[in-house]
């Protein structure tokens, strides 16, 4: 509470002060941080503006779905259950840094991650080169994952992808480790 945080001396006094400091603008719910010795006026302004704490979780590229779900499970401030790996499949979530607020659910975050992946994949699929031997955006994602596993050097990825594309055109196996 604001009293526990030292922002207000008393709840009743704070309620009275609100009538004078914020008669027409409601306070917004959320998690806030206040600097030591913050004035009541500044605290109310922050509560009205909704200047809440923004938390974040970073999902690195190259993680499996199981590893991503472990990162999400360990993110402080998220609520709700974490789905099973089998509910999502590999490559379902875009690796990125995601921002969230205290109390957001893991399901909501995962929905944002899958929507971001879908939007990015659609954009890339629509801009792809003609004549590639790939039948769907998902096949392109699988090939991209294989290429990333094959080389850790970004400058080599186009050449490695070219080798795999040529093998697919010829009906050969990819023969990737």
Spans of model-derived segments:
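Conserved catalytic or metal-liganding residues and their short signature motifs at active sites
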Residues: 1-175
């Amino acid at each position: 509470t604001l009293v526990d945080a030292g922002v207000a001396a008393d709840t009743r006094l704070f309620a009275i002060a609100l009538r004078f400091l914020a008669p027409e603008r409601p306070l917004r719910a959320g998690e806030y941080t206040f600097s030591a010795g913050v004035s009541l006026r500044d605290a109310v302004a922050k509560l009205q503006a909704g200047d809440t704490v923004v938390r974040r979780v970073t999902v690195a590229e190259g993680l499996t779905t199981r590893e991503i779900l472990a990162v999400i499970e360990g993110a402080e401030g998220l609520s709700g259950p974490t789905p099973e790996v089998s509910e999502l499949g590999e490559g379902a979530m875009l690796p990125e840094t995601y921002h969230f607020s205290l109390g957001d659910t893991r399901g909501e975050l995962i929905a944002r991650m899958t929507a971001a992946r879908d939007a990015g994949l659609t954009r890339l699929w629509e801009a792809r080169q003609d004549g590639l031997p790939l039948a769907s955006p998902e096949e392109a994602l699988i090939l991209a994952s294989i290429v990333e596993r094959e080389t850790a050097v970004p400058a080599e990825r186009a050449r490695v992808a070219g080798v795999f594309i040529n093998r697919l055109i010829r009906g050969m196996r990819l023969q990737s480790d």
